[in-house]
Amino acid sequence: VSDVPNNDDRFTY
């Protein structure tokens, strides 16, 4: 996932 915003609350890649 390279289109992930600054949401470390949902995506923790």
From Swiss-Prot:
Coiled coil: none
Listed GO MF terms: chloride channel activity
GO cellular component: chloride channel complex; endoplasmic reticulum membrane; intracellular membrane-bounded organelle
Domain of life: Eukaryota
UniProt PTM: Major plasma membrane substrate for camp-dependent protein kinase (PK-A) and protein kinase C (PK-C) in several different tissues. Phosphorylated in response to insulin and adrenergic stimulation.
Keywords for this protein: Chloride, Chloride channel, Endoplasmic reticulum, Ion channel, Ion transport, Membrane, Microsome, Phosphoprotein, Transmembrane, Transport
Membrane topology, record value: Single-pass type I membrane protein
Compartments reported by the entry: Microsome membrane; Endoplasmic reticulum membrane
Similarity remark: Belongs to the FXYD family.
Function comment: Induces a hyperpolarization-activated chloride current when expressed in Xenopus oocytes. May have a functional role in muscle contraction.
Name the record gives this protein: Phospholemman-like protein
